Amino acid sequence: MAWKDLLVHIDDGTASPGRVAAAIALARAHAAHLTGLYVVAEPELPGFLLSELPAAWHEQTRRQGRERAERAAARFREAAARAGLGADCRIDRGLEGEVSAVVAVHARYADLVILGQADPDEPEPARRPAPEAVVLGCGRPAIVVPYIGVGPTIGERVVVAWDAGREATRAVNDALPLLTKAKSVIVLSANPRPTPAGHGAEPGADIAQHLARHGVTVAVEHIEASDIAVADAILSRLADAGADLLVMGAYGHSRARELLLGGVTRQVLPQMTVPVLMSH
């Protein structure tokens, strides 16, 4: 399926312009419509405290949130207009602890959502969605853009982290609009062992053949690494290959308000330096 409807989360952070630029580049490459989404994060305070605060405080908080959203929306529209791209912007609201859930709901009505990697130096992290929570909740693929920005290309040289599991299979399928345009694709398996329920007799060969039938130029590689070093080995291979995109399954689940992530997913997200396409 082609990507024709993209959603990008925008905010006031220093990384937002780079994320918007990446989203615009993707929208132009796929002749897709782009929507920006700003979520006004309302303070999550105990009910008894909220009731004690004066009405003027509530009004000022709402006004400041609205003004921040409108400024961010204006910057987004200006960037899209400079690129000659058709785009619109939405503004929604949610409690600080519910921003990820709000973004996930909007993402369900897009082909792809573009999110930002968490920046440890950025203030007010509760006002921004957690990429892993959005991916686990939206049922759509996401591209997570590093907070340091991206290079001149996204998806020309791709590494697929392949373990023959359901999540990786979903990620490869969701990434096909990019993979079919890529100049090179490496299917990378860590510690692969032939098993009837997963890797075949020649690990990676089955998915490589499937991709080749879509016209993808693909190579298969295996790496050996301890369980705790798999993420580091994947990231190292990305750098060696000069890759500009990693495709991987998002492993984990959410229970109540607790997010439980698989080890590789948990380790890759904070360390990534190129965009990561994730699906669950």
Q: What are the functions of these language-model segments?
A:
Residues 20-29, 102-151, 238-280:
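Gly/Ser-rich helix-loop-strand patches that form or flank binding pockets
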Residues 44, 97-99, 122, 152, ...:
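Generic structural signal for helix capping and beta-alpha/helix-loop junctions
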Residues 56-71:
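A short acidic, glycine-rich active-site loop
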Residues 1-58, 137, 154-223, 243:
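Small/aliphatic-rich secondary-structure junction motif
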Residues 19, 99, 127, 168-171, ...:
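Amphipathic coiled-coil/heptad-repeat helices and related helical stalk/stem segments
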Residues 78-113, 213-246, 253-255, 274:
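Structural beta-alpha unit
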Residues 77, 81, 86, 123-146, ...:
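P-loop/Walker A phosphate-binding loop and immediately adjacent motor/lid segment at beta-alpha junctions
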Residues 14, 62-63, 93-96, 119-121, ...:
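Short histidine/acidic/glycine/proline-rich micro-motifs that form metal-
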